[in-house]
Amino acid sequence: AGDHCKAASDLGLPFVAVGLMYHQGYFTQIIDEHAEQRVEFHPHRLDDLPITPAIGGDGRQVEIELAFPGRSVRVRVWQAMVGHLNLYLLDTDVPGNRDDDRAITYQLYGGDRTTRLTQEIVLGIGGVRVLRALGVAPSVWHINEGHAAFLVLERCREQVAHGRSFAAALEQVAAATLFTTHTPVPVSYTH
């Protein structure tokens, strides 16, 4: 998605992006003495990254809560600049969260199906709620790959809560949503 951000910045488009704050970043692939692939993650120190707390209207770092079965997960938000545009990064490594919930945003492509699904809920539903908390009201929403698809359901939920039928909400949300994929092969599909 970085290329979308860079291009939008270069073109001067009014654009904001939301992603996950992966504390261990991308992995390094190592081939060991048995010609087997090993994956090594290298934790980031937040102080070393070009990010700052995303500050809300109350002057404090934006933090939201997401309901999961039997628990609530706190998500705090960081801000990075990509050219002239804001990139908001969602982070579950928050004191008070369970250890497994703190790890939701540790690794890109890490974990099992449950971890991936949980990351997608944080990104999709959490992303909408974060933009609302920041006072950002996009006229068009773009989903790059299926990882943020839960934003469609969250936006429909908002409209139904305001009295629209689900069918009307879905129609309006669909009309203001774009989807792109950079890996159009079955192996890349999220199920």
Where is each model-derived feature located?
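An acidic- and aromatic-residue-enriched active-site/binding cleft used to recognize and process polar
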Residues: 13, 18-25, 31-32, 93, ...
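A conserved hydrophobic secondary-structure block that centers on an alpha-helix together
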Residues: 1-11, 17-18, 110-139, 143
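Acidic, Ser/Thr-rich peripheral helices and adjacent loops at domain boundaries
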Residues: 29-55
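Conserved small/polar residues in nucleotide/adenosyl-binding loops
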Residues: 190-191
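Active-site cores of enzymes that catalyze phosphoryl transfer or operate on phosphate-rich substrates
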Residues: 58-129, 180
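Active-site proximal beta-strand in glycosyltransferases
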Residues: 90, 160-183
